[in-house]
């Protein structure tokens, strides 16, 4: 494409043409800099969604979003082994904060976690909401987050703090009220750029697209979608998994029952308001057994599996991860991780304001 303008990009999308990475990066740059108007943002998002986003197009959006992000500069060796445990949200299931709890379990097992998230979108309690309720300050800057990762084994990048340019798209997204490409960017745009991730996606078409972006940049990731629609490794149905590693993507259908996890129902995993979900975190860390623990264990196991080879048969890696995850809770390591994290975060908070 020659000179990039909104009419040119929109016309191409309406024809059904695939945009190149530079095209979508340009569009995202215009949006995040505040140069795009509401009609241009809405037209682009809807036209791209109607055509169907491709890995190439999504990669351009991700590239521009990271360019405009406030970076978290982790040491190279830490970034190479750190993992994000995150979901796109949007599954409308209103579960407890499974990925948040799994993050604490993974960190308790000795793997550094850099979590990227926001307040609730489709549910009543997002990652940021429950962490804030538990005592974690959300206004930490990049240096403070890096300190948390180094000293507590876990840090949280509050999306609103690290992607300020996304405020220009917020009103349009709310008015549209339907999922667009913006709904799938969060897990791909962690400002700390960890090289591994266990990533939930509610959309069956977009999950392999996200996996292809992870693969293209050399990350090790498991993209997860429950057959019940959960953006997690579900225990209420089989889970479709896209394993991205070494530049390739492999798809598999797994069932938590094959790992010895009892079948649950979505009602077993239902959450509530922020106080309810925070109490669920405390009960899990105190050793309470049941469906919530089971769901947390299998999602933590998926994150731990990304630290090694993602072979065609993931069962062995997941079973090993389940043992490590259970020990993280039962030894008290996960609970101590939360306590240490809050302590470090409160200590470094003044430097981040």
From Swiss-Prot:
Residues that hold Mg(2+) 1 according to the record: 99, 232
- Transmembrane annotation, as ranges: none
Q: Which residues bind Mg(2+) 2?
A: 231-232
Q: Which residues bind anthranilate 1?
A: 87, 118
Top EC class, one word: transferase
Pathway(s) where this gene product acts: Amino-acid biosynthesis; L-tryptophan biosynthesis; L-tryptophan from chorismate: step 2/5
The UniProt catalytic activity note for this protein reads: N-(5-phospho-beta-D-ribosyl)anthranilate + diphosphate = 5-phospho-alpha-D-ribose 1-diphosphate + anthranilate
Which residues of the sequence carry a binding annotation for anthranilate 2?
A: 173
HAMAP family in the cross-refs: TrpD (MF_00211)
**What protein name is recorded for this chain?**
Anthranilate phosphoribosyltransferase
List the source organism. Salinispora tropica (strain ATCC BAA-916 / DSM 44818 / JCM 13857 / NBRC 105044 / CNB-440)
Record lineage? Bacteria, Bacillati, Actinomycetota, Actinomycetes, Micromonosporales
């Amino acid at each position: 494409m020659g000179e990039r303008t909104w009419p040119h990009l929109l016309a191409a999308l309406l024809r059904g043409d695939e945009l190149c990475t530079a095209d979508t990066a340009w569009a995202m740059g215009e949006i995040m800099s505040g140069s795009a108007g509401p009609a241009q943002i809405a037209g682009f998002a809807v036209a791209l969604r109607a055509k169907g986003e491709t890995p190439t197009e999504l990669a351009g959006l991700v590239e521009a979003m990271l360019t405009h992000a406030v970076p978290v500069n982790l040491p190279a060796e830490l970034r190479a082994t750190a993992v994000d445990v995150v979901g796109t949200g949007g599954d409308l299931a209103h579960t407890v904060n499974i990925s948040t709890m799994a993050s604490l379990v993974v960190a308790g097992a000795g793997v550094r976690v850099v979590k990227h998230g926001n307040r609730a979108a489709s549910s009543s309690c997002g990652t940021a909401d429950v962490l804030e309720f538990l005592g974690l300050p959300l206004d930490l800057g990049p240096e403070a987050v890096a300190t948390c990762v180094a000293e507590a084994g876990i840090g949280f990048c509050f999306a609103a703090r690290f992607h300020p340019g996304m405020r220009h798209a917020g009103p349009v997204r709310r008015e549209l009220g339907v999922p667009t490409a913006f709904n799938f960017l969060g897990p791909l745009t962690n400002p700390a750029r960890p090289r591994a991730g266990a990533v939930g996606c509610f959309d069956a078409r977009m999950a392999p697209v996200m996996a292809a972006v992870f693969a293209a940049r050399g990350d090790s990731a498991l993209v997860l979608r429950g057959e019940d629609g959960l953006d997690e490794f579900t225990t209420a149905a089989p889970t479709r998994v896209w394993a991205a590693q070494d530049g390739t993507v492999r798809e598999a259908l797994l069932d938590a029952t094959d790992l010895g996890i009892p079948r649950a129902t979505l009602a077993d995993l239902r959450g509530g308001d922020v106080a309810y979900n925070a109490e669920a975190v405390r009960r899990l860390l105190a050793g309470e057994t049941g469906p919530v623990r089971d769901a947390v264990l299998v999602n933590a196991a998926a994150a731990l599996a990304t630290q090694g080879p993602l072979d065609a048969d993931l069962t062995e890696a997941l079973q090993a991860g389940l043992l490590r995850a259970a020990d993280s809770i039962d030894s008290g390591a996960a609970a101590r991780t939360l306590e240490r994290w809050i302590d470090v975060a409160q200590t470094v908070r003044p430097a981040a304001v």
